[in-house]
């Protein structure tokens, strides 16, 4: 959740909407709540501690996630729960690391960075809890499309955003 920064920016830009942020880490939820209060958007924004693989209690028009699915213990289940939480014409906006399918396609400075983060944080975080251990280079577009199809999504569209580091997808139930 990065302490609520994305949701706070959205609430400032689109004040007629309601926003809910979720994170498994309680102290991050507390900090995000304080940040929303300081930004003057606490009446539009709430933050809750939740492991999304346990499901959502509400349905949403838009769900976003930023650089987190590859870290999850069970990314497939998380995607299933996200799909179930969207209204029929809703949208899941997913930002992930711009990794490629083949090892040699990830070679170079960015690949070095991706694999370093994977080994030192992303994979170990997931594997320590019995997860899949995808890591930053473990969720290329082909695998994401496979996971989304399994989760019940009908459409995955890669948005045309030029960024060597990240990729953004518009995903529909």
PLM-predicted stretches and their roles:
Residues 76-88:
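A short glycine-rich, Lys/Arg-flanked "PGG" loop and its adjoining helix->strand segment in the class I
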Residues 50-63:
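A short acidic, Gly/Pro-enriched loop at the edge of an enzyme's catalytic core
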Residues 61-76:
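A short SAM/SAH-binding and catalytic strip from SAM-dependent methyltransferases
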């Amino acid at each position: 959740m990065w302490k609520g920064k994305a949701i706070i920016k959205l609430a400032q830009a689109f004040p007629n909407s309601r926003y809910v942020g979720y994170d498994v880490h309680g102290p991050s939820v507390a900090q995000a709540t304080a940040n929303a209060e300081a930004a003057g958007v606490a009446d539009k924004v709430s933050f809750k501690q939740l492991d999304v693989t346990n499901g959502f209690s509400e349905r949403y028009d838009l769900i976003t996630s930023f650089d987190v699915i590859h870290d999850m213990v069970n990314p497939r289940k998380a995607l299933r729960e996200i799909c179930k939480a969207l209204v029929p014409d809703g949208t899941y906006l997913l930002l992930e690391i711009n990794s490629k399918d083949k090892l040699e396609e990830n070679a170079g400075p960015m690949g070095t960075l991706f694999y370093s983060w994977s080994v030192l944080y992303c994979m170990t975080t997931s594997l320590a809890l019995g997860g899949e251990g995808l890591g930053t280079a473990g969720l290329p577009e082909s695998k994401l499309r496979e996971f989304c199809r399994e989760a019940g999504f009908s459409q995955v569209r890669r948005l045309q955003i030029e960024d060597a580091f990240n990729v953004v997808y518009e995903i529909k139930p």
